[in-house]
């Protein structure tokens, strides 16, 4: 990820963003600033309330009382101003990967934003202790506090896996058996843009949650055709796209900002086949695959290593210190949570 990202109105890319985005420093680091009133389905990428309360309430919808209690807590936190949050280094995708130069600029940009947005909470998403130790020390010096966010899974293929798990072997064999066409596109036609957008909506929005980023056609057009990302597409014998994954590369790391597959197409193991193609691409590139969160059991059975990811938050300036105490309390309350705790709960 670098300065090649175009300057756009965020809503033109993410219709439920409820935020504006600016670019700071010599490394063009993105900073998203929430706007209020927020969209009722504000994406979790830009809204702490959506990430920690609304999304959880959605997942607990089969338990109405639990969902209502979680939503009530979210309302209380919103009264304390959490909807007004500026996120530093926050690309409009689920997992932001920074260069070393960008990480060096984060503390100074944080100080700048604290001055320019004194009534906002300041946050940094996607912090991993095993990858961001120096940055964590710098943020602690600025009194940022760590709040557990989610469990992400890494596949370190920079020197290859020593052993291929049995589930992964079966996925790779299935991909080979089906004799599908696989293309890693650096440009998309209008027809392809419409198709991948449709597949994304089927999985992320219709199957899972409207709190996921509601990407527009313009997003898929610009991130691929302006070569910010590539698009791995799997086609059938009729040359119809049956699944896809956006590939975002930063140094040695690959992330998957969006994917989708046709849930109505009669393809054996659609998600397994797509993962096998993603894995093969990452292995051939000798990359570190950050495969984000979700489907934890699936990823662990294929060699994914779980890590607890954090969001670091700094309270805004205020007269009575209530927001500072809230953040300190939340950090202390959650400090004993580890990755296995969340895995037991389905992460």
Spans of features found by a protein language model:
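Aromatic (often tryptophan-rich) hydrophobic motifs at membrane interfaces
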Residues: 219-324
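A conserved beta-strand-loop-helix scaffold within acyl/acetyltransferase catalytic domains
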Residues: 1-26, 33-39, 124-147, 157-266
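Active-site/acyl-donor-binding loops of N-acyltransferases
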Residues: 142-162, 288-347
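Hydrophobic, Leu/Ile/Phe/Ala-enriched alpha-helical segments that form helix-helix packing faces
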Residues: 56, 60, 109-117, 139, ...
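Conserved donor-binding loop and adjoining core beta-sheet/short helix segment
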Residues: 15-114, 241-264, 310
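Acyl-donor-binding surface of acyltransferase catalytic domains
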Residues: 66-181
């Amino acid at each position: 990820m670098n300065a090649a990202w175009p300057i756009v109105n965020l809503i033109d890319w993410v219709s439920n963003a409820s935020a504006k985005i600016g670019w700071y420093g010599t490394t063009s680091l993105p900073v998203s600033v929430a706007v209020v009133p927020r969209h009722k389905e504000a994406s979790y990428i830009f809204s702490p309330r959506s990430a920690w309360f609304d999304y959880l309430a959605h997942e607990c919808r089969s338990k109405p009382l639990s969902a209502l209690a979680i939503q009530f807590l979210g309302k209380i936190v919103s009264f304390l101003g959490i909807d007004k949050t500026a996120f530093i280094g926050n690309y409009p995708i689920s997992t932001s990967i920074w260069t070393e130069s960008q990480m060096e600029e984060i503390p100074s940009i944080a100080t700048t934003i604290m001055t320019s947005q004194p009534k906002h909470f300041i946050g940094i998403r996607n912090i991993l202790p095993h990858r961001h130790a120096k940055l964590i020390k710098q943020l602690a010096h600025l009194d940022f506090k760590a709040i557990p966010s989610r469990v992400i899974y890494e596949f370190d293929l920079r020197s290859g896996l020593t052993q291929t798990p049995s589930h992964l072997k079966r996925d790779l064999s299935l991909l080979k058996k089906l004799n599908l066409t696989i293309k890693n596109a650096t440009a998309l036609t209008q027809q392809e843009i419409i198709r991948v957008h449709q597949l994304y909506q089927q999985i992320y929005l219709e199957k899972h949650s409207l709190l996921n980023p509601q990407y527009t056609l313009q997003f898929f057009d610009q991130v691929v055709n302006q070569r910010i990302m590539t698009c791995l597409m799997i086609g059938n014998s009729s040359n119809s796209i049956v699944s896809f994954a956006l590939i975002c590369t930063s140094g040695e790391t690959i992330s998957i900002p969006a994917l989708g597959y046709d849930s109505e197409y009669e393809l054996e193991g659609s998600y397994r086949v797509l993962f096998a193609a993603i894995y093969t691409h990452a292995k051939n590139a000798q990359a570190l695959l950050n495969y984000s969160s979700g489907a934890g059991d699936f990823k662990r059975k294929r060699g994914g290593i779980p890590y607890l990811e954090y969001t670091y938050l700094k309270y805004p300036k205020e007269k009575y210190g209530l927001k500072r105490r809230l953040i300190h309390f939340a950090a202390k309350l959650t400090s004993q949570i580890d990755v296995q705790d969340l895995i037991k709960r389905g992460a």
